[in-house]
């Protein structure tokens, strides 16, 4: 049995839909990195949200509700692409404290947990190198997507950037990613991959 999770609350500062997609994808990548059978996975969605109801206390409630709708649309899109059923979940929708200018709200957040079958735990990849001279491969594509990343926040803190970046990672073709994950998991279980880490 493999258990993993994914969470990316900072992405909500730019796009709550991308935040949800990234959380699901991270949970899947974590599981794939140890060799989960991607045909035997299921997920749990846990929404932790600021008050999404328009009111005097929550003047931006419509925007927070729109973020929730966007996150749910991405939840459906990515889970369908990964053939990943959500078997349970939990929603906490009033994660705010205080009033007026002193009000503190959590960022719109989806914690996505995943569990799945591992055919043979003796064929599990770990993140450490095994031998001097091991080859390193980057699987997938790299894009201009550093928005809300650790690098963006570091540059802002150092005064080298005004905002938190531009584009957050987007999953434009999750079906293609899922094929890569399937191949990678098969390679791990065949003993071809000994070390693996998701980034």
Q: Model-predicted segments: where are they?
A:
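Glycine/proline-enriched, intrinsically flexible loops and inter-domain linkers
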Residues: 1-197
């Amino acid at each position: 049995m493999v258990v993993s999770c994914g969470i990316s609350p900072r992405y909500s500062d730019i796009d709550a839909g991308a935040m949800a997609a990234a959380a699901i994808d991270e949970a899947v990548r974590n599981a794939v990195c140890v060799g989960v059978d991607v045909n035997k996975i299921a997920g749990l969605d846990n929404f932790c949200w600021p008050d999404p109801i328009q009111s005097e206390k929550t003047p931006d409630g419509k925007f927070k509700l729109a973020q929730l709708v966007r996150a749910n649309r991405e939840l459906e899109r990515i889970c369908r692409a990964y053939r990943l059923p959500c078997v349970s979940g939990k929603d906490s929708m009033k994660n705010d404290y205080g009033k007026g200018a002193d009000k503190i709200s959590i960022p719109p957040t989806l914690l996505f947990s995943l569990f799945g079958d591992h055919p043979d735990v003796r064929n599990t990849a770990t993140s450490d190198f095994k031998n001097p001279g091991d080859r390193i491969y980057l699987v997938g594509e790299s894009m201009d997507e550093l928005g809300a990343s650790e690098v963006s926040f570091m540059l802002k803190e150092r005064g080298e950037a005004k905002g938190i970046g531009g584009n957050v990672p987007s999953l434009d073709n999750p079906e293609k990613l899922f094929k890569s994950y399937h191949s990678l998991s098969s390679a791990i279980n065949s003993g071809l991959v000994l070390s693996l880490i998701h980034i």
